C-alpha cells in the first residue's frame, strides 16, 4: 500500500508539472501573437540602425528605458518592409511578470509554442527577438543552441552585467555582435523634438542652440523627452532611478545597507568627471558612523557600472598594472536623472557638458577604441586610443573667456600631446569656435552642439 501511495503521489506531481507547462505554453503563444498584432510599430528612428541580415547573435546591452526594445522594433519594421511576414517574427519580453518563474529548461517551450502556432514555418526562416532575456538564468546556453541548431536571426537585449561585451564574448563564444544603446544623442533628441539639424536658417540655428542648452541639463531618456509635463518627467526619472537602485542593485546583489548605498551613489554623482578615491569616500562614510567595508564600496562601484548607471574611465598609462591602481573618473548615464536625484547647482554646467561629451564618445567610438584620461603635471579630459595608437585628445570646458581657464586647457592638452605623440587635438566648449596655433601645433575649438551633429 505504501508503494502505491508513493506512486500515486508521483503521478499527481507529474500531472501538476504537465499542467504548469501547458499553461506556460499558452501564455507564450498569447505573447507571441500579441506582439505580431502590433506590427508595424510606431517608433521614431534612432541614429544607429541594427542589421537585418546579420548571421550572428545581435546583442543590445544598455541601461533601463534607453530604447533597446525600440531598436528591435525598428529592425522588425525594416524586415516587414523587405517582405518578411509578421508570422515569421517571434518576439518575447522576459520582463513580463507571467514569465518570472521561467527556467532555462522552460525556454524550449518558446520554440514549442511557436511551432504549434505555425507548424508550416521552418525555424530557420524565423527572426527571434528576446527582450531582457538575461532575467532567465543560463539563458546563453539556450540562445547558442538555438543559433547553432535552428535559427541564425537572433536579437537579444538586456540591462545588466550579463549583456556587457566581456560577458558576451565569453558566454556566446564568438557568435555574438554587440550594439550598445544609450539615452538619446543630441541629434536624436532634436529628432524627437522636431527640431531641424541640417540646412539651417537663422531662426533654426537659434532654436538649435536653445535645444542644446536644454539637452545639456535635461534627461535624454526617450520617454522622458517626449513627455511635456515637467512633474511627470521628474516622476519618470525617479521611477527609473529607483528601479536601478532596487532591482539592479539591492535585490540582485542582496545589499542590506540601502541608505549607505544611496549616499555612495550621490558622492559619485557629486564628484562627476574628477578622479575619485573610493578610499576617501570610505573614510568619510566611516566618520559618520555608518557600517560598511571598503571591499563593499569597491564592489558597489563595480555593480553601478555593470547596471550602466555609471561609466568609468581609467588614467592613461602604458602599464596595465598602474592603470588598475589609479583612480577612476566616473560619469553618469543621464544628466537629467542626476539633476532629479541631486539639487541642481549653477556651477554644474561644465560637469554636465563633460558628462555629455563622454556619453557621445561612448556612442560613437569603435569597439576597439578605449577612452582614458591624461593626468601628469597638467590634465587632459579624454585620450582616445586604439591598441598602442592614440587617435585623438579632447579637452572640455564651458568657456575659454577667462585667461586662466584658457591657459589651463591649452597647456593641459599640449602636455598630453607631447606625452602621447598625438597632434589631433580638440577643445569642446559651450559656444566658442576658433583655431589655435601654438608650438607648431593646431588645436581646434568647437561648440558642443556642432561637434555632436
Annotate each language-model stretch with its function.
Residues 153-159, 180:
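Structural recognition of the conserved hydrophobic beta-strand(s) that form the central parallel beta-sheet
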Residues 14, 88, 230-390:
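Accessory nucleic acid-recognition modules appended to NTPase machines
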Residues 68:
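Conserved lysine of the Walker
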Residues 24, 33, 167-275:
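Interdomain motor-coupling "hinge/lid" segment immediately C-terminal to the ATP-binding subdomain
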Amino acid at each position: 500500500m505504501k508503494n502505491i501511495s508513493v506512486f500515486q503521489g508521483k503521478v499527481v506531481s507529474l500531472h501538476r508539472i504537465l499542467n504548469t507547462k501547458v499553461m506556460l505554453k499558452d501564455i507564450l503563444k498569447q505573447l507571441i501573437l500579441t506582439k505580431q498584432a502590433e506590427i508595424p510599430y510606431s517608433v521614431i528612428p534612432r541614429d544607429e540602425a541594427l542589421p537585418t541580415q546579420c548571421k550572428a547573435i545581435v546583442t543590445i546591452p544598455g541601461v533601463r528605458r534607453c530604447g533597446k526594445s525600440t531598436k528591435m522594433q525598428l529592425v522588425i519594421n525594416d524586415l516587414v518592409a523587405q517582405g518578411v511576414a509578421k508570422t515569421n517574427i517571434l518576439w518575447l519580453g522576459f520582463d513580463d511578470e507571467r514569465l518570472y518563474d521561467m527556467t532555462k529548461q522552460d525556454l524550449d517551450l518558446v520554440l514549442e509554442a511557436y511551432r504549434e502556432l505555425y507548424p508550416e514555418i521552418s525555424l530557420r526562416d524565423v527572426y527571434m527577438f528576446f527582450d531582457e532575456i538575461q532575467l532567465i538564468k543560463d539563458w546563453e546556453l539556450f540562445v547558442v543552441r538555438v543559433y547553432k541548431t535552428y535559427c541564425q536571426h537572433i536579437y537579444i537585449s538586456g540591462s545588466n552585467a550579463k549583456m556587457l561585451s566581456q560577458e558576451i564574448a565569453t558566454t556566446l563564444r564568438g557568435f555574438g555582435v554587440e550594439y550598445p544603446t544609450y539615452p538619446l544623442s543630441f541629434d536624436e533628441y532634436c529628432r524627437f523634438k522636431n527640431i531641424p539639424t541640417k540646412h539651417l536658417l537663422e531662426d533654426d540655428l537659434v532654436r538649435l542652440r536653445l535645444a542644446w542648452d536644454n539637452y545639456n541639463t535635461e534627461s535624454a531618456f526617450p520617454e522622458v523627452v517626449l513627455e511635456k509635463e515637467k512633474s511627470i518627467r521628474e516622476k519618470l526619472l525617479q521611477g527609473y532611478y529607483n528601479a536601478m537602485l532596487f532591482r539592479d542593485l539591492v535585490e540582485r546583489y542582496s545589499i542590506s545597507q540601502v541608505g549607505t548605498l544611496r549616499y555612495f551613489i550621490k558622492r559619485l554623482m557629486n564628484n562627476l568627471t574628477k578622479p575619485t578615491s573610493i578610499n576617501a569616500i570610505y573614510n568619510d562614510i566611516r566618520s559618520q558612523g555608518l557600517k560598511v567595508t571598503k571591499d563593499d564600496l569597491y564592489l558597489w562601484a563595480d555593480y553601478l557600472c555593470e547596471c550602466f548607471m555609471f561609466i568609468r574611465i581609467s588614467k592613461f598609462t602604458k602599464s596595465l598594472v598602474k592603470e588598475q591602481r589609479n583612480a577612476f573618473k566616473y560619469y553618469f548615464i543621464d544628466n537629467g536623472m542626476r539633476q532629479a536625484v541631486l539639487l541642481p547647482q549653477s556651477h554644474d554646467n561644465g560637469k554636465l557638458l563633460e558628462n555629455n561629451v563622454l556619453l557621445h564618445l561612448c556612442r560613437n567610438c569603435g569597439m576597439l577604441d578605449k577612452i582614458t584620461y591624461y593626468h601628469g603635471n597638467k590634465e587632459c579630459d579624454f585620450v582616445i586610443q586604439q591598441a598602442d595608437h592614440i587617435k585623438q585628445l579632447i579637452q572640455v570646458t564651458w568657456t575659454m573667456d577667462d585667461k586662466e581657464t584658457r591657459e589651463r586647457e591649452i597647456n593641459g592638452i599640449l602636455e598630453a600631446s607631447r606625452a602621447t605623440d598625438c597632434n589631433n587635438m580638440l577643445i569642446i566648449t559651450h559656444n566658442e569656435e576658433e583655431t589655435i596655433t601654438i608650438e607648431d601645433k593646431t588645436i581646434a575649438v568647437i561648440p558642443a552642439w556642432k561637434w555632436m551633429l
